[in-house]
Amino acid sequence: MTKLTLSALLIALTAPALAAASGDADHGEVLARHWCAACHIVAEDQEHGADNVPTFSAIANKQHFDQAGIARFLQDPHPKMPDMQLSTYESADLAAYIETLKK
């Protein structure tokens, strides 16, 4: 296998992982408003959320916020959260959106 072929193969295999890691914040906002807004306040224009549930802004502004960690968490959420069965890409998109709420 030539170096060029090997390089092309490595790029092809890692591109989806890199895309998932960065996420699409605009799509993440759409997902947040659809899946998460019943409990979490996901945007500044939202007035109501469930009691004792952090807002997305509060999550984004935690001292140790980690976009990749949030994306992993969404793949296997805690028992109080519904299992939305998000794809890796959708989890990355939601995490990217939450990242935009940092102040």
Report each predicted region and the residues it spans.
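Periplasmic/extracellular electron-transfer cofactor-ligation site
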Residues: 22-52, 77-79, 100-103
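Sec/Tat signal peptide C-region and signal peptidase I cleavage site
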Residues: 15-21
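Gly/Gly-Pro-rich "capping" loops immediately C-terminal to redox-active cysteine motifs
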Residues: 29, 44-71
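Soluble non-cytosolic domains of exported or imported proteins
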Residues: 26, 64, 85-89
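An amphipathic alpha-helix signature
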Residues: 67-75, 92-95
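C-terminal capping alpha-helices of c-type cytochrome domains
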Residues: 85-103
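Sec-dependent signal peptide recognition
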Residues: 2-10
